[in-house]
């Protein structure tokens, strides 16, 4: 008799190989999502989405998948994930009272160790409790109190763009000696503006990014935090396997540096809280959060929750708004008819800087608002999918010919960039066409259809708490610029920075990092002729 000797290593290799084959067969043929088309590798492993996260084109790949596969509105984008590209799916997944909760991956997403802010809290009841508290600091009534601060920041933003030479990039080519400034990277200046606004609103103090470069590193800190989150929402096990140190070591370091700085500011701000309570001082968001009590339980936020929520508010409120603002400059500088129309509207409605307010004059600038909405549609700040897990019983999504049932325990989402470029809701989806948001020009039905698929700030109870502020910041800044300056795209290679290539020419293309990392457009400014 011949005896074969098999080493323990060989046995383990065989077991791992066999288990891998079994898992692959299950995912390809027996998984509840097996019937849905999608990239072959995505059906087998989440490393497919990690690849597109690493290269920052995940939002584009999602759009391409919807256009490539036969069941175009339903695409499998992970072993346990499906994308839905319809307004019915969008509302079924994200609206109030639906049978979904945040995906399990968000358990790894924490801006402060051991604490989950509203953004990453999975439990719906816990989220509702936190949202009630945070909402007290970002109510419309509170935002109205900051009208003057918003206006002053917008006017400072405009004056910085109007300077002949960029104070933070003095080596840029000078203007053409005909009144035009040197090229300005509007992405950078938009970051400075929105971050100053949010830090002032939240902490009652500003990082002064519009006037001093000392704290410009905080922008990189925010982007580092977002880059880290983008990987963890795709594959949360990365941190357990220590792959975060390989895939995004610099992002991780920047994220922690920003968190430490925000804690320092929080402690300094907290020490002044008692003093401010007894003064006739304007109440910032932090003081409101500090004083907020849940109307049902009477509970208030812990110190760590205060840190996490204030961190989140600054990041969410600044990063999303800055993308919308930079995108607005991009599209207006490339669409002369829209630029001329909105410029005329603003200059006719607003006669002094005091008119830049939450009053009837700025509100009457409906085409300005339409330009902002169209820019957010074409280049959404959060272009990927916000994943949700279906609860027991699953989720039913209405379809044109039959309903779709998503089983419980599976993950589902809608790619924001993809649905924003779905011609079912947006005819000529790659064309900058602000008129699509004006009922008097396209009709109520067309506007309602466009609104049904618009998700720049998400929907329902998990929507961005700062969306109302964002829709003020951007028009304030654009109005402040257009009241005093003309602007144009730079006529040099710098003018192409931020623009897509090939079929995406004319599009403001961002790097997907959960939110958006952006560069450009480079714009020149010239003081308005009297």
UniProtKB/Swiss-Prot annotation:
GO molecular function, one term: monooxygenase activity
Induction: Expression is positively regulated by the apicidin F cluster-specific transcription factor apf2 that binds to the eight-base-pair motif 5'-TGACGTGA-3' called the 'Api-box' that is found in all promoters of the apicidin F cluster except in the promoter region of apf2 itself.
Transmembrane parts of this sequence: 6-26
Cofactors, names only: heme
InterPro entries: Cyt_P450, Cyt_P450_CS, Cyt_P450_E_grp-I, Cyt_P450_sf, Cytochrome_P450_monoxygenase
Binding site for heme: 464
Functional pathway: Secondary metabolite biosynthesis
GO CC annotation: membrane
EC number(s) recorded for this UniProt protein: 1.-.-.-
Applied value in biotechnology: Apicidin F, like the other known apicidins, is a cyclic tetrapeptides with anti-malarial properties via histone deacetylase inhibitory activity.
Keyword terms of this UniProt record: Glycoprotein, Heme, Iron, Membrane, Metal-binding, Monooxygenase, Oxidoreductase, Transmembrane, Transmembrane helix
Localization: Membrane
Entry-linked Pfam families: p450
Sites where a glycan is attached: 85
Membrane topology reported for the UniProt record: Single-pass membrane protein
Keyword match Iron: yes
Role played: Cytochrome P450 monooxygenase; part of the gene cluster that mediates the biosynthesis of the cyclic tetrapeptide apicidin F (APF). The non-ribosomal peptide synthetase apf1 incorporates four different amino acids to produce apicidin F: L-phenylalanine, D-pipecolic acid (D-pip), N-methoxy-L-tryptophan and L-2-aminooctanedioic acid. L-Phenylalanine is the only proteinogenic amino acid directly used by apf1. The 3 other apf1 substrates are non-proteinogenic and have to be modified by other enzymes of the cluster.
Family the UniProt entry places it in: Belongs to the cytochrome P450 family.
Record protein name field: Cytochrome P450 monooxygenase apf7
Gene source species: Gibberella fujikuroi (strain CBS 195.34 / IMI 58289 / NRRL A-6831)
Gene name of the encoded protein: apf7
